[in-house]
Amino acid sequence: MESSQAYFPPSANKKHVLLTWAQSINGRIGYVVESPSLGQLRLSSKESFVMTHLLRTKFDGIMVGSRTAENDNPSLTAKLPDPANPDCLLPLNKQPIPIIVDSNLRLDYASLKVIRLARERLGKPPLIIVAPSIWQQVQHDSKLKEAVKLIQSVGGRCIIRNEDSPDSWSDYVALDKLLQNGVNRIMVEGGAELLAKAFGSTDIDAYVVTIVPKIFSCSNTTEIKNLNNLNLTTNSHWYPCGPDVIFTNYSDEFYESYKSLLTNSDAI
C-alpha cells in the first residue's frame, strides 16, 4: 500500500477501503487466544472509541475476520454520541453492514451478536465471506447447512469468493463481489491476520491507527505482522484523541468532524 492523502468523508459512489486498529506503544493489539478470565484486551480510550463509531457511520460495511468475531463477538454497530451507552444505538438506516470473513463457516452463528441484532432489526443483516470448496459442501454437511440457514433467517447472505486460498487480499475478501452488491466503503477493523494480509494490497485507500499509552506483555498478546508493507511516512497526520494519539492519512476534515461531534451531538 502506498500512502497518499485520503479525503473524508469517503464518497458513497466509489470504492474506499479503510484499515483501522488500536495498538499499545509496544504494538500489541489483542490476546493470542480467547480468555474468559481476561476478556477483550482494552486499548482505546473513551475519546478514541467515539472516533471509531463516528467512522462507522461513514461506511457501508465493517469487516472483521473469523477469529475476531469469535474472540470479541463484536456488535459491529454505530452508537453515538456515547458508544458505551446502549441507548445511543443509531437508527438502522445509519448502521453499517457487518462483514465477516469466515472462509470455513466455522463460527457458532447462534451466539453472535450480529445475528441477534439483525433478528431484532437493531443491526443490518451480515455478509459472510466463504471459500468455494466449503460452499460446495453445504448441501451435504448438516452443520454447514444449519449455519447458512441461520444466517439467511435474519436476512444475511454468504458471499462466495472465487478461490479457496487466493494470494490477493482483495480476492480473499471478495472485494469485487462486495462492490457489486453496493458495499463501496469498507472499514476493516481486524484482526491481526486480516490486517496483515491487507498491507501489501493496492486496494487500500486509508488507515487510522490509534496508539494508546499502555504496554502489554508479549507472552499472551499478539501483534500485526508485515507492517513494513504499509508506507506510513508521507501524507500522514498525528492528532490527539484524549490520552491516545491517532495516526492517519485522512485529510484534516476527518479530525474536524470528530471535534464537532464532541461539542455538538447534532453533528452525527
From Swiss-Prot:
It catalyses: 2,5-diamino-6-(1-D-ribitylamino)pyrimidin-4(3H)-one 5'-phosphate + NADP(+) = 2,5-diamino-6-(1-D-ribosylamino)pyrimidin-4(3H)-one 5'-phosphate + NADPH + H(+); 2,5-diamino-6-(1-D-ribitylamino)pyrimidin-4(3H)-one 5'-phosphate + NAD(+) = 2,5-diamino-6-(1-D-ribosylamino)pyrimidin-4(3H)-one 5'-phosphate + NADH + H(+). GO terms for cellular component: cytosol; nucleus. Pathway: Cofactor biosynthesis; riboflavin biosynthesis. Keywords: NADP, Oxidoreductase, Riboflavin biosynthesis. GO terms for molecular function: 5-amino-6-(5-phosphoribosylamino)uracil reductase activity. Pfam families: RibD_C. GO terms for biological process: riboflavin biosynthetic process. Its EC number is 1.1.1.302. Catalyzes an early step in riboflavin biosynthesis, the NADPH-dependent reduction of the ribose side chain of 2,5-diamino-6-ribosylamino-4(3H)-pyrimidinone 5'-phosphate, yielding 2,5-diamino-6-ribitylamino-4(3H)-pyrimidinone 5'-phosphate. Homodimer. This is 2,5-diamino-6-ribosylamino-4(3H)-pyrimidinone 5'-phosphate reductase. It comes from Schizosaccharomyces pombe (strain 972 / ATCC 24843).
